[in-house]
UniProtKB/Swiss-Prot annotation, chain A:
The modification Phosphoserine is found at residues 199, 252, 255, 273, 287, 340, 417, 420, 478. Phosphorylated during mitosis. Component of ORC, a complex composed of at least 6 subunits: ORC1, ORC2, ORC3, ORC4, ORC5 and ORC6. ORC is regulated in a cell-cycle dependent manner. It is sequentially assembled at the exit from anaphase of mitosis and disassembled as cells enter S phase. Interacts with CDC6 and KAT7/HBO1. Interacts with LRWD1 predominantly during the G1 phase and with less affinity during mitosis, when phosphorylated. The gene is ORC1. Residues 501-861 are annotated as: Necessary and sufficient for ORC complex assembly. This is Origin recognition complex subunit 1. It comes from Homo sapiens (Human).
Swiss-Prot record, chain B:
This is Origin recognition complex subunit 4. GO terms for cellular component: chromosome, telomeric region; cytosol; nuclear origin of replication recognition complex; nucleolus; nucleoplasm; nucleus; origin recognition complex. ATP binds at residues 67-74. It is linked to Meier-Gorlin syndrome 2: A syndrome characterized by bilateral microtia, aplasia/hypoplasia of the patellae, and severe intrauterine and postnatal growth retardation with short stature and poor weight gain. Additional clinical findings include anomalies of cranial sutures, microcephaly, apparently low-set and simple ears, microstomia, full lips, highly arched or cleft palate, micrognathia, genitourinary tract anomalies, and various skeletal anomalies. The keyword DNA-binding applies.
Length: 861, 436
């Protein structure tokens, strides 16, 4: 793997390109493009929204990869900061070691994963961006090119959500492809121009060779924690730009015709990568986690002591992925000087940072920000989104051509500096690589303000990503679970309620309504409540989850402002007030008692604080949160009414009239009238759900599905029931099959049997299978009921009837004890309802079955 | 010489017999998973397939095993688990959690027990720390972390499942079923219960999450099978050390099962209850009568054991009462006849008794009132009479309303067998007007 020179001894200046797009609602100015200038060599990189960037982290050989979504200036605090919002990708080495096996194959050396983890903070300091990188999305069928020699290209095929690897969804795939294509379009004319400006002998292959050379040297370099972009980086960027249009052309046409796709890509990679990658290198990357602790100790020249002293808070800071601060910059410089003592000072392009430098840079930044003119405030309504997008595209195009022009002009300088730095790096001994990042990304949001003040470098390795130290986990199995072997097994897997479908059929309307509600609240930066009701198994929670998932994607694509999503479930609480504790913990990670948590939350939501992102709170099983004073419901629905809270509450319960039935007026008034009711599924909807799950799988006869759907629709309309019955039907089908390998089809008989098994009452069979004395006792009860005309009798009365019956049927005389045993036996099965037996003779007995059923069961002998 | 031979024979017998008794008692008292299953092959297959799918494929499931007491629910699940654990890939990959509704009487205790049995991180030694809320969120998080393919499947066995349904909000059941229906750690929830109306006990949300699989065990065998079970339960295993004795014993058992009187006993037992525990009880009593001098079970043993089993417990108590107490019971019986099951008090009973003593009887001593009161209270202690619930307050003891817990037929039957009963008392019992 290449060393990505991140912190060289030059410093970089970051400035915005283009006019800011001020958004009043968002309280910050957004930009389309950023320009990074490196001190000393007057090169510039232009980074645009939608491009893939490298971001410096604690592992310098594997800097973080992300897609730039938004550039903006955060001026909430006096020194305005350049911030960026990104969509992260993870490298395989960043995946926790214990989860790596989930991939189930060897990862490609340049494979990265779309990081689908909404809790991860995507808001970063723009000044940590190192440079550009190419990311090529692969369709699920594609093979990740393994022995590709072009290392500046990364491939994304799967997404990783901290739980499992999933193939990229088709929208995502298209989305990843799109920006490159558009960039290619923009750059096409420019490329032609730049090519003509270059010396004719420069073929792409040569470019690559040059770049690889630089990369080789870079791998030996000692990274220094300064932001500036080095000449090398500049060079790489330039090459990347040259390669880009060609590459994206390749991919775009490749995606049109799939059969030849892989071949072509491989061919291309061969052209661009003449040098072979060394095998040991790869091994090293695969096992950095193991070596990490010792290595950090080795590297930690001066800051190990600091680290030891660090308080827990500091440790949290340590784990965040941030640019090293200026103070550490200086110190690291100092520690490095002895190592790089053999360097030729004349070629060292780096400038050792001194306090004056920092000041100067700050001033420069401030100036740059002042220059940013404010555009008229826009209200970001849906209607205006389109126009805005058009404007953005225009701006991007303009910025692009301009930056390319600049690049062309400064090319020679870059070349010179490149070679010099190569030599310098060759002289430095190779240093052990740093520990891979094991950062908790969730924490970064709370640390915006501390970005520039912190004084530690992340060194702690192998920290769990969750903020909790003791991550509870069920032991993982030593042997992998078997995969479905037959069609029926596959069907069973898909029919399991837990199998998450790609889309929720038959709930499109409800989905749209909820989506619109939450989206409008997000766009308006207001709060609100919505009450969702419906009988169990109608897809309430699933629909809300789907909405949130879509909104999170939209937030990543920058269509809606980012938001925080919290979910609580009334049934998963031991006590209603625990809901405060859970919300607080999910919101801020704090732990507190219920009362304290309530205070903190009230403070957070009701006081005028710093602008925060909107919180979407899903309260499942709302009725469980009922208390006598109803203070919890009151609070939950009161917070959104505060202007500063920016809280959207989605409350789910079963009963439609819950607000009227159990809530006080002041609570139900705050809940408002935004209500939605999920109707039970009709039979055709259930049928559609089953069909969509069994798509392309011939396991069921159509009639069998229809029968199940009709039966369930008639009874409850519960989708879970429907799926469970079908699952059982596949089992019955499998049992009835004699030959295990014959492709059996679930017929109507099988589903009928499953339906009967699940819905039929067992009382009658129970009576039929009970002993003679039990049956005659039941007869005695019927006789006694008929005699007295009541539906209840004491044991004594029934006993006398029972004795008479036994005498008639020639059974031996039943003693009182025996009869009592019979009675309590029937009572324990709940065929009878009996009083506690301490009442003895006087205990009252009732039938729990209808008299007709008993008669039917007894007669049938 | 012959006497010595017989002596040594009897010695061998005592040894063998103690072994026989040990083996058989173990069989009767303990539900060992070694015993054979009968008549539940279909259910067994269903359950074991389900467990296998959870263990091998990581498919979550929930199932209820429903059947009356003594129908072999626990035996079925034990068998299935034993078979499951014999599969090599499974034995290390499956965690088991056993809960019992009678032990884990609320969710708090149940959660601690689950955490302890799963040996999660907050278990120190044998204790689980943290509050109820913490434990719940801890456990839920632990289970949420896993997924189908990589986590160890957990099998939850909830004995006396109906009692869990009475826990507050059914939190535990909701969460278990919710996990079984969502893509988390694969779990199998197996509930054992004897209540046929169990589904009505579940709250609607809990019910919706339950997969509605029910395995019914109904004791659906007939009398011939019952006799077969009897034989099977009583026969000695092939690996019994003394082969000769075992052969003889088994022959005897075969002979017994064909004996008419034995079959009558068994038929009677079968009529009362198909519960195998009651059969075990009968056999246990019969087994206790086997001694060195009487090494093989006979039909008489079984008949006497059966009599012991079907004894009326209250009649037995009546046999041990004093004459005065018997007289009081008879007085109460008459009161019941006169006032048609209305409750009575001590004073009424005393008056009735006085009438009998003064008019006719000379055999019964005219006891003083406190003595009679004492006898009355003794009857109450034996729970042959029971105070009415409402009037337990501050009324005087003499006037507290009571009810008799003996049936007329019971009293008459008991008097028949009562030793040394005075004739006039017996006469008085048959008719309250006998002194006229």
């Amino acid at each position: 793997m290449a060393h990505y020179p991140t912190r060289l001894k030059t410093r970089k200046t970051y400035s915005w390109v283009g006019r800011p797009l001020l958004d009043r609602k968002l309280h910050y100015q957004t930009y389309r493009e950023m320009c990074v200038k490196t001190e000393g060599c007057s090169t510039e990189i232009h980074i645009q929204i939608g491009q893939f960037v490298l971001i410096e982290g604690d592992d310098d050989e594997n800097p973080y990869v992300a897609k730039l979504l938004e550039l903006f200036e955060d001026d909430s605090d006096p020194p305005p900061k350049k911030r960026a919002r990104v969509q992260w990708f993870v490298r395989f080495c960043e995946v926790p070691a214990c989860k790596r096996h989930l991939l189930g194959r060897k990862p490609g050396a340049q494979e990265i994963f779309w990081y689908d983890y909404p809790a991860c903070d995507s808001n970063i300091n723009a000044e940590t961006i190192i440079g550009l990188v190419r990311v090529i999305p692969l369709a699920p069928k594609d093979v990740v090119p393994t022995n590709l020699k072009n290392e500046k290209t990364l491939f994304v095929k799967l997404s990783w959500n901290e739980k499992k690897f999933r193939p990229l969804s088709s929208e995502l795939f298209a989305e990843l492809n799109k920006p490159q294509e558009s960039a290619a379009k923009c750059q096409k004319p420019v490329r032609a121009k730049s090519k003509s400006a270059e010396s004719p002998s420069w073929t792409p292959a040569e470019h690559v060779a040059k770049r690889i050379e630089s990369r080789h040297s870079a791998s030996k370099s000692r990274q220094t924690p300064t932001h500036p972009l080095t000449p090398r980086a500049r060079k790489r960027l330039e090459l990347g730009n040259l390669g880009n249009p060609q590459m994206s052309q390749q991919t775009s046409c490749a995606s049109l015709d799939s059969p030849g796709r892989i071949k072509r890509k491989v061919a291309f990679s061969e052209i661009t990568s003449p040098s072979k990658r060394s095998q040991p290198d790869k091994l090293q990357t695969l096992s950095p986690a193991l070596k990490a602790p010792e290595k950090t100790r080795e590297t930690g020249l001066s800051y190990t002591e600091d680290d030891k002293k660090a308080s827990p808070e500091h440790r949290i800071i340590l784990r965040t992925r941030i640019a090293a601060s200026k103070t550490i910059d200086i110190r690291e410089e100092r520690t490095l000087t002895p190592i790089s003592g053999g360097q030729r000072s004349s070629v060292v392009p780096s400038v050792i940072l001194k306090p004056e430098n920092i000041k100067k840079r700050d001033a420069k930044e401030a100036k740059a920000q002042n220059e940013a003119t404010s555009t008229p405030h826009r209200i970001r309504r849906k209607s205006s989104v389109l126009t805005m997008n058009r404007i953005r595209q225009q701006l991007r195009f303009l910025g692009n051509s301009k930056s390319d022009q600049e690049e062309k002009e400064i090319l020679p300088a870059a070349e010179i500096s490149d070679s010099s730095s190569d030599e310098e790096e060759a002289s430095t001994p190779p240093l052990p690589r740093r520990a891979p990042r094991t950062v908790s990304r969730n924490l970064r949001s709370s640390l915006k303000s501390s970005l520039h003040t912190l004084t530690k470098v992340p060194k702690k390795s192998l920290k769990p990503r969750t903020p909790r130290c003791a991550a509870p986990q069920i032991r993982s199995r030593s042997l992998a679970a078997q995969e479905p072997a037959s069609v029926l097994e596959e069907a069973r897997l898909r029919l399991h309620v837990s199998a998450v479908p790609e889309s929720l059929p038959c709930r499109e309307q409800e989905f749209q309504d909820i989506y619109n509600f939450v989206e409008s609240k997000l766009l308006d930066h207001t709060g609100g409540c919505m009450y969702i009701s419906g009988v169990p198994g109608t897809g309430k929670t699933a629909t809300v989850h789907e909405v949130i998932r879509c909104l999170q994607q939209a937030a990543q694509a920058n269509d809606v402002p980012p938001f925080q999503y919290i979910e609580v479930n009334g049934m998963k609480l031991t006590e209603p007030h625990q809901v405060y504790v859970q919300i607080l913990q999910k919101l801020t990670g704090q732990k507190a008692t219920a009362n304290h948590a309530a205070e903190l939350l009230a403070k957070q939501f009701c006081t005028r604080g710093s602008p925060q992102e909107t919180t979407v709170l899903l309260v499942d099983e709302l009725d469980l949160l009922w208390t006598h004073k109803q203070d919890i419901m009151y609070n939950l629905f009161d917070w959104p009414t505060h202007k500063e809270a920016r809280l959207v509450v989605l409350a789910i319960a079963n009963t439609m009239d819950l607000p009227e039935r159990i809530m006080m007026n002041r609570v139900s008034s705050r809940l408002g009238l935004t209500r939605m009711c999920f109707q039970p599924y009709t039979y055709s909807q259930l049928q559609q759900i089953l069909r969509s799950r069994l798509k392309h799988l011939k396991a069921f006869e159509d009639d069998a599905i229809q029968l199940v759907a009709r039966k369930v629709a008639a009874l409850s309309g519960d989708a879970r029931r429907c799926l469970d019955i079908c699952r059982r039907a596949t089992e019955i089908c499998e049992f009835s099959q004699q030959k295990p390998d014959s492709p059996g089809l679930v017929t109507i008989a099988h589903s009928m049997e499953a339906v009967d098994e699940m819905f039929s009452s067992s009382y009658i069979t129970a009576i039929k299978n009970s002993s003679v004395l039990e049956q005659s006792f039941l007869r005695a009860i019927l006789a006694e009921f008929r005699r007295s005309g009541l539906e209840e009798a004491t044991f004594q009365q029934i006993y006398s009837q029972h004795v008479a019956l036994c005498r008639m049927e020639g059974l031996p005389y039943p003693t009182m004890s025996e009869t009592m045993a019979v009675c309590s036996h029937l009572g324990s099965c709940r065929l009878l309802l009996v009083e506690p037996s301490r009442n003895d003779l006087l205990l009252r007995v009732r039938l729990n079955v209808s008299q007709d059923d008993v008669l039917y069961a007894l007669k049938d002998e | 010489m012959s006497s010595r031979k017989s002596k040594s024979n009897s010695l061998i017998h005592t040894e063998c017999l103690s072994q026989v008794q040990r083996i058989l008692r173990e069989r009767f008292c303990r539900q060992s998973p070694h015993s054979n299953l009968f008549g539940v092959q279909v259910q067994y297959k269903h359950l074991s397939e389900l467990l296998k799918r959870t263990a091998l494929h990581g498919e979550s499931n929930s199932v209820l095993i429903i059947g009356p007491r003594g129908s072999g629910k626990t035996m079925l699940i034990n068998h299935a688990l034993k078979e499951l654990m014999e599969i090599e890939e499974v034995s290390e990959n499956v965690l088991q959690v056993h809960l019992n509704g009678l032990l884990q009487i609320n969710d708090k205790i149940a959660l601690k027990e689950i955490t302890r049995q799963l040996n999660l991180e907050n278990v120190v030694g044998d204790k689980v720390f943290g509050s109820f809320a913490e434990n719940l969120s801890f456990l839920l998080e632990a289970l949420k972390k896993g997924d189908r393919t990589s986590s160890c499947p957990v099998i939850f066995i909830l004995d006396e499942f109906d009692l869990f349904a009475h826990h507050k909000n059914q939190t535990l059941l909701y969460n278990l079923f919710d996990i079984s229906q969502s893509a988390q750690t694969p779990i199998a929830v197996i509930g054992l219960t004897c209540r046929l109306d169990i589904l009505e006990l579940l709250e609607k949300r809990v019910k919706s999450r339950f997969s509605h699989r029910q395995i019914h065990l109904m004791n659906s065998f007939g009398f011939p099978q019952y006799v077969k079970i009897f034989k099977e339960q009583l026969s000695l295993p092939a690996e019994f050390p003394d082969k000769v004795f075992a052969e003889k014993w088994n022959e005897n058992v075969q002979y017994l099962s064909e004996d008419r009187s034995v079959q009558e006993v068994l038929q009677k037992h079968f009529n009362i209850s198909k519960n195998l525990r009651s059969l075990h009880m009968l056999l246990m009593l019969a087994l206790n009568r086997v001694t060195a001098s009487h090494p093989f079970m006979t039909a008489v043993d079984l008949m006497e054991a059966s009599q012991l089993c079907s004894m009326d417990s209250k009649a037995n108590i009546v046999h041990g009462l004093s004459v005065l107490e018997i007289c009081l019971i008879i007085a109460m019986k008459h009161l019941n006849d006169i006032y048609e099951e209305e409750p009575f008090n001590f004073q009424m009973v005393y008056n009735e008794f006085q009438k009998f003593v003064q008019r006719k009887a000379h055999s019964v001593y005219n006891f003083e009132k406190p003595v009679v009161m004492k006898a009355f209270e003794h009857l109450q202690q034996l729970e042959l009479i029971k105070p009415m619930e409402r009037t337990s307050g501050n009324s005087q003891r003499e006037y507290q309303l009571m009810k008799l817990l003996l049936d007329n037929t019971q009293i008459m039957n008991a008097l028949q067998k009562y030793p040394n009963c005075p004739t006039d008392v017996r006469q008085w019992a048959t008719s309250s007007l006998s002194w006229l």
